[in-house]
Amino acid sequence: MLFVSLCKARAGTPKENIARRAQWQYPEGTQPVAEYWLQTTDPTVIVISEADSIAPMMSAVADWDDVFEFTVVPAIAAEEGLELAKQMMQG
């Protein structure tokens, strides 16, 4: 299952946060698909991850909730969404 995390900066300096990120590893059970660092404040970071459940996402949020305000939502790729739409229209 794909999850998209929208991360809004809360505290800390970019230098501190980058140093912290360099040492941090994604939780076990999480496969990062993409991580984007934006030149905006909301969101500051977008992460797309794959996991079997929400549990690893909750762990990542707990690791970073002092630095970012999170919105985590399940997502599907456009191709999968189009296939599901075709199935719904047929049934």
Regions found by a protein language model. Name each.
Residues 1-91:
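Conserved, structured core segments of small domains
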